[in-house]
Amino acid sequence: MKLHGYFRSSAAYRVRIALNLKGLQPAHLPHHLRQGEQCAPAYLAINPQGLVPTLEDDSGTVLTQSLAIIEWLDEVHPSPPLLPKDPLRRAKVRAFALAIACDVHPVQNLKVLARLRQLGVAEEKVAEWAAWANREGLAACETLIAGEPGPFCFGDKPTIADLCLVPQLANARRFGVDVSAYPRLLKAEAAAKEMKAFADAAPDKQSDAE
């Protein structure tokens, strides 16, 4: 199994956590996003979107998009489960994960910020945009789990929600967001970071970390 990623990619970070929780050890193949290595013809032949992560299983099957990869891993390697059994709880976990993966992350990722710069947006405004996107999204996520006792986002075990939350909080801090405004999210993050699977997946622990 091979995982194509980049140490700072929050989408790849999610998948690294899932792989660690499942006890899987793929070969890690880094692609430097800031240097454009994801646009190399050889990589585009694997992932036409030119994004990370991409997972290649032992049969050569290629999977893209972090949440699709994580759900596939959860189905093929069901222990420990990353989604609750109850259909309603599953829907709530997915809604939280999608709020981050679809609504927050895409509008502040490297590709979008680079395009803003190409269009002549001042660096100060680019930074403001990224911080705004994180603040707006995390505030909504805080409300989504405000009534959940925890310690994780949904219950006493990590789910896909936690796999999305921890990397996004790292992004928010990088963009200068004061995350103390989200105590319930920080409670879930603290529980997650006590687990080796999360700690080992952190960007600064990766072979391509800068």
Give the ranges of each region predicted by the language model.
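GST-like domain detector, emphasizing the conserved glutathione-binding G-site
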Residues: 1-125
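Generic structural signal for helix capping and beta-alpha/helix-loop junctions
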Residues: 13, 36, 189, 209-210
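Conserved beta-strand edge residues that scaffold enzyme active sites
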Residues: 33-34, 186, 206
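Substrate-binding/catalytic groove segments of enzymes
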Residues: 81, 150-151, 199
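GST-like fold's C-terminal all-alpha helical module
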Residues: 100-194
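Terminal-tail/helix-coil boundary detector
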Residues: 198-210
